[in-house]
Regions:
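Membrane-embedded alpha-helical bundles that constitute the cytochrome b-like, heme-associated redox core
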Residues: 1-208
């Protein structure tokens, strides 16, 4: 703390992503890869199981977006479209992004990804009733959105020399010393929500 008072612009590693968000992110990556692999290898059982895992993770993330740590909350990172556009316009510059969590553009991307996941899962449930085409279409749309997400990560590395992947692994981001630390919620609450989400997804899997 004393160091922050010496130089308010000095960059210090600050916890920005809690364990729940990081675990959610990488489990989601894994289950999405398995879901697509199951579809391409014509393994419907694997595809279905991974799809319901995605549903559980999605339900958890939505809940954590309202009651979770500051940087996980929708209210913290959902800004106006104008703010997102200004953030995108600033992308080609060398000006470092000092957002504690998601900036405005990344916030919108997060919501778009969650919405695309929800649509893909929803059409997947409808697929069991014979509606195959919408699910396949959403799967391709989701791939496009994921590609855009990866392109943004590469753009930040190229233009701003910022690694967006490392903080999602370590939970820490280098920020000016005067930056207020975000509030982190008890991870036991996250575990309880994940278990509830898993139970709901399991129940849905027996309904469809």
């Amino acid at each position: 703390m004393a160091l922050r008072n010496v130089n308010r612009d000095f960059l210090l590693p600050m916890p920005v992503w809690d364990r729940a968000i990081r675990l959610f992110h990488w489990l989601l990556v894994l289950t999405i890869v398995i879901a697509y692999a199951g579809a391409w290898m014509h393994q419907p059982g694997l595809h279905r199981a991974s799809g319901f895992c995605v549903l559980a993770l999605l339900l958890f993330r939505i809940a954590w977006g309202f009651v979770g740590s500051d940087t996980a909350r929708f209210a913290q990172f959902m800004k106006s479209p104008g703010a997102a556009w200004r953030q995108l316009a600033d992308l080609p510059t060398r000006t470092p992004d000092r957002s504690v969590g998601h900036n405005a553009a990344c916030g919108w991307m997060t919501v778009i990804i969650l919405a695309a996941l929800a649509s893909t899962v929803g059409t997947g449930l409808a697929r069991t009733a014979g509606q195959v085409t919408p699910h396949a279409q959403m799967a391709w749309i989701l791939l496009g959105i994921i590609a855009l997400h990866l392109a943004a990560i590469l753009a930040y590395a190229a233009f701003k020399r910022q690694n967006l992947v490392r903080p999602m692994i370590t939970g820490r981001k280098r920020l000016p010393g005067a930056t207020p630390a975000p509030r982190m919620m008890n991870q036991a609450l996250a575990l309880a929500l994940l278990l509830i989400a898993g139970a709901v997804s399991w129940a849905v899997s027996h309904w469809f």
